[in-house]
């Protein structure tokens, strides 16, 4: 029988995959306190190129997707993890950050933190296990010059 925390982790895998629009051919890095468990769950679902933060290699912009499970942790601690993740992500990478349900001010802080690192917020969602946002690197949205 699985523990409630792992079962909760299992419940966020499908929504995170759907939000990111992941394919089994993409390289995925998973961060957060349960990153190994989430990586193994992704492997069971056929995402064999998924790696946990602890075994993701050297940062060379090799990952297409970052899935960050940041439930039961502070947004301040997320800053350090986000800084660390940046060099692992390709110029067209997507980022999904899953957090506990938050007050509007905390959501704005999260959005500002993600935007500060060169991401454009594409979508946000609320789920029974918390809330998540999807962001893409701003290089994926080139600035159009005026005529």
Across the structure, where does each feature detected by a protein language model lie?
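Core SAM-dependent methyltransferase catalytic element
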Residues: 113, 117-147
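Conserved class I S-adenosyl-L-methionine
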Residues: 23-37, 97-120
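A short glycine-rich, Lys/Arg-flanked "PGG" loop and its adjoining helix->strand segment in the class I
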Residues: 77-94, 111
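Short acidic, S/G/P-rich loop/turn micro-motifs used as interaction or catalytic elements
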Residues: 35-38, 69-76, 101-104
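A short, well-structured beta->alpha microelement
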Residues: 11, 15-16, 34, 39-62
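A short acidic, Gly/Pro-enriched loop at the edge of an enzyme's catalytic core
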Residues: 55-76, 80-83
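Class I SAM-dependent methyltransferase Rossmann-like catalytic core
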Residues: 1-25
């Amino acid at each position: 029988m699985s523990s409630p925390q792992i079962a909760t982790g299992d419940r966020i895998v499908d929504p995170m995959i759907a939000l990111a629009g992941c394919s089994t051919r993409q390289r995925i890095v998973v961060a957060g306190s349960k990153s190994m468990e989430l990586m193994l769950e992704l492997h069971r679902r056929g995402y064999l190129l998924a790696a946990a933060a602890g075994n993701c290699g050297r940062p060379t912009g090799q990952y297409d997707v970052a899935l960050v499970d940041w439930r039961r942790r502070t947004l301040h601690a997320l800053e350090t993890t986000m800084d660390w993740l940046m060099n692992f992500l390709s110029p067209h990478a997507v980022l999904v950050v899953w957090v506990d349900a938050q007050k509007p001010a905390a959501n704005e802080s999260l959005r500002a933190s993600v935007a500060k690192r060169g991401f454009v917020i594409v979508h946000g969602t609320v789920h029974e296990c918390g809330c998540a946002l999807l962001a893409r690197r701003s290089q994926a949205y080139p600035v159009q010059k005026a005529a």
